[in-house]
Amino acid sequence: MIYFSDKELDDLLLEDIYRGDLTTHALSIENIPAKILFKRKNAGVVAGVSVAEKLLKKLDIQPHLYVKEGEWVESGALLISAEGMSEQLHQAWKVVQLVLEWSCGVAQYTAEMIANAKSVNPTAVVACTRKSIPNTRKLATNAVLAAGGHIHRQGVSETLLVFTNHRNLLSDPNDWTKIVDRLRQEAPENKITLEADNYAQFEQMYMAEPDIIQLDKWLLEDVKKALDLLQSKQKDILLSVAGGVNKNNVSDYAKLGIRLFITSAPYYVPPEDIKVVIEKI
């Protein structure tokens, strides 16, 4: 489970309720005991319930959870219920709903992409990038993990990944062996990934024997050529594909023999529909 600090939870709440609920106050219904229900409209994967629970508790509402992160539910399934005064419930309503809707959307797409990849290659791994919508990375990470996905990397300090923009600043940007040797010396605990923009680059860099070569925005036929070359040279280098990889084409790459898929696609899908009902006790 991803840890969310009090500040992060407060920031989510204060974006919507920084001056209270004017409508509830104007109708003088703040102190009416009530209950709130959150239901998933369509069948699918659930994510965000752990964050939703914390948000409700921040408003002194004690929630009841009926599902766990990553659980598959039927349409209309009750995810969370809670009881409290109308004022608190109305303040919680939209923030919790949005967290659930967006998280479930990310998780649903991730789960479908994983299923498509594993239908061809049971060892396939779908890893999501750091290219999330700004200020949503932790929510996105929580949703991806709930769906059974992996994280490519959370930030630039986590892995060694050499892009062309790094090499542009080197005195000899095409000395792949020197680049790999330097990285092995400076960060011996980390695997080394080089990104190949095209097949011509790949033909040069594979001889330096990095741990992983990431193929960015490659056509299927070029990916196959790269795989065939490594096999013919008996090089034990893992290939990953990135750039435009989504649930609709992941199986095409898997059929070639790729097992590591780098994607940002889950972050930009429509949210799932979470129905919310508030009613008197």
From Swiss-Prot:
Q: Which domain of life is it from?
A: Bacteria
Q: What is its EC number?
A: 2.4.2.-
Q: Which GO terms describe its biological process?
A: NAD biosynthetic process; quinolinate catabolic process
Q: Does the keyword Ubl conjugation apply?
A: no
Q: Name one GO molecular function term.
A: nicotinate-nucleotide diphosphorylase (carboxylating) activity
Q: Hey, which family's this protein in?
A: Belongs to the NadC/ModD family.
The protein, known as: Putative pyrophosphorylase ModD
Query: What's the source species for this entry?
Result: Haemophilus influenzae (strain ATCC 51907 / DSM 11121 / KW20 / Rd)
Q: Tell me what gene encodes this.
A: modD
